[in-house]
Amino acid sequence: MTPRADGRPTSHHVRVRDLRLHYLDFGGDGPPLLFLHATGFHAWVWAPYAEHFRATHRVLALDQRGHGESDKPPSGYRWEEFGADLMRFLDALALDRVHVVGHSKGATAIAAAAAAGTERLARAVLIEPVLFAGPLASAPIRESPLAVGAGRRREVWPSRAAMFDSLRPRMPFETWQEEFVRCYVDHGVADRPDGQVVLRCPGAIEAEIYAHAPMTDGFALLERLHVPVLLIGGERSPGLGEREAAEALRRLPAGTLLTVPGAGHFVPMERPREVMEAIARFLAEPRAPTRPT
């Protein structure tokens, strides 16, 4: 596909079994490059990345179940479900040799899709994947701090401008480049009849995702990802520390690591230039990367 003259993506829905999944097609020439967002976000947060990469790739971004303009079923929020959705999405669009980039939950969903059996991936970039190892939970942990906090999240604002002003000085948004905050706000809410705006990803769904996360061994999923993988972490991230990164590299059949100095879990929004450059170098490699000796 060729890029639209105005640079805006086209909006589409595709049926994946009993779900309607929404995605953005930014156009571009070259192999497909698909972006997957983190919990609570949406496809539009990748718009600055799409602008960068559509000179070399056909860029798409997916609203995962429960997010954005995709369906929001009351259940089905384990990592395995997100992985199965991704596999079926690629099948529905008949995309092959796909380069895929995921952040946080989106990164883990890529590994889960590989574990589900997809063979449509060419390369994968996992940015701050969510990785749990044993002992795993046998049931959702709804009293976890993340789940409880998400369940209490404010969902309604008088306007997008009021939402931006409220969120911009707070974590995690205070460390983001401003264009990413505006993408999150502008497209992360829907208009209500009373003139207010409401989150497209309800707090209850976000809470369900966090509650189910400790039920899956994310490190085991990595072992099924038999394509070249670039693992990106933020130096200040509490989730992907040295121990977790080393274990992830041990499990990945063909993985390399980049740690971005001074960045945290939201490194793609905090340090986009460094992340874009790293992704571009990785996607341009002619052969699978080799581990340093």
Q: In which residue ranges do the predicted regions lie?
A:
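Alpha/beta-hydrolase fold catalytic core
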Residues: M1-F35, A55-H57, L95-D96, A280-T293
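Conserved HGGG/HGGXW glycine-rich cap/lid loop of the alpha/beta-hydrolase fold
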Residues: L19-K72
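The conserved beta1-alpha1 loop
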Residues: L36-A38, H103, G233
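Conserved hydrolase catalytic core segment
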Residues: H52, D96-A139
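Conserved acidic catalytic loop of the alpha/beta-hydrolase fold
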Residues: G83-V98
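Helix-rich cap/lid subdomain of alpha/beta-hydrolase
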Residues: G134-V197, Y210
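Conserved serine/cysteine hydrolase catalytic core
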Residues: E179, V189-R250, T259
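Catalytic histidine-centered segment of alpha/beta-hydrolase-like enzymes
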Residues: V260-P272, M276
